[in-house]
């Protein structure tokens, strides 16, 4: 039987653009009966020194560790990429990522542009997607509606968002989240199209191709 390796998808977005909600909706959609055996997308769980927010679960949303443990993991070469954002450290486990891909699962990696650069250097075959808000005003409103941050933090996030968005042209695909349902369909289309590339189809249907051309 042909071994099929999964595809790594890097997804980046400024805080408040809707990345987390879109990825969750994508994961929920693949559980629908019509997707059947094609339901093989996984989401990478990053390590972070950030404090856990209400409703988050350790090992599900993030692997929460203290700074000393994170630094130890860096020294041991455990991370494929790591970055510091708003004073918090984030990193992706190299061994878990490779194991998931080797098992044939597509893997979503939600990281910022700094981490994306690091990953693309080591894994140039990864697909990359950038999610944009429809406007700065809409982004500010979304951050305010969260009710999680002070005005000062929101201003800092807006400044960071502009910096983050300036790197959109480093990505293969861009999704503008002006309508959630439409943005979700755009995201699904990227995954569907990638599964139809010649390379992917050759991996999946190698025996069929040999038979057809015999």
UniProtKB/Swiss-Prot annotation:
One of its GO terms (cellular component) is cytosol. It holds the Pfam family Guanylate_kin. It is found in: Cytoplasm. It is an enzyme of class 2 (transferase). CDD domains: GMPK. Signal peptide: none annotated. ATP binds at residues 13-20. GO terms for molecular function: ATP binding; guanylate kinase activity. Keywords: ATP-binding, Cytoplasm, Kinase, Nucleotide-binding, Transferase. Its EC number is 2.7.4.8. It catalyses: GMP + ATP = GDP + ADP. It comes from the Bacteria. Residues 6-192 form the Guanylate kinase-like domain. Its main location: cytoplasm. Belongs to the guanylate kinase family. Essential for recycling GMP and indirectly, cGMP. HAMAP family: Guanylate_kinase. This is Guanylate kinase. It comes from Pseudomonas syringae pv. tomato (strain ATCC BAA-871 / DC3000).
């Amino acid at each position: 039987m042909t071994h099929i390796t999964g595809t790594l998808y890097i997804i980046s977005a400024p805080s408040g653009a809707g990345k987390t909600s879109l990825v969750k909706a994508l994961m929920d959609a693949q559980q629908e009966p019509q997707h059947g055996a094609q339901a093989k997308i996984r989401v990478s769980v990053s390590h972070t020194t950030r404090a856990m927010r209400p409703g988050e679960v350790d090992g599900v949303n993030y692997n929460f560790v203290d700074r000393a443990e994170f630094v130890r993991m860096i020294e041991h070469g455990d991370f494929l990429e790591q970055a510091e954002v708003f004073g918090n450290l984030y990193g992706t486990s190299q061994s878990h990522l490779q194991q998931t891909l080797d098992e044939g699962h597509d893997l979503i990696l939600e990281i910022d542009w700094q981490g994306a650069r690091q990953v693309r250097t080591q894994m140039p075959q990864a697909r990359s997607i950038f999610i944009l808000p429809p406007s700065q005003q809409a982004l500010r409103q979304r951050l305010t509606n969260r009710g999680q941050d002070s005005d000062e933090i929101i201003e800092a996030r807006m400044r960071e968002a502009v910096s983050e968005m300036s790197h959109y042209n480093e990505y293969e695909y861009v999704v503008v989240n002006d309508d959630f349902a439409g943005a979700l369909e755009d995201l699904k289309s990227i995954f569907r199209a990638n599964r139809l590339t010649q390379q992917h189809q050759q991996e999946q249907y190698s025996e069929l191709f040999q038979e057809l051309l015999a």
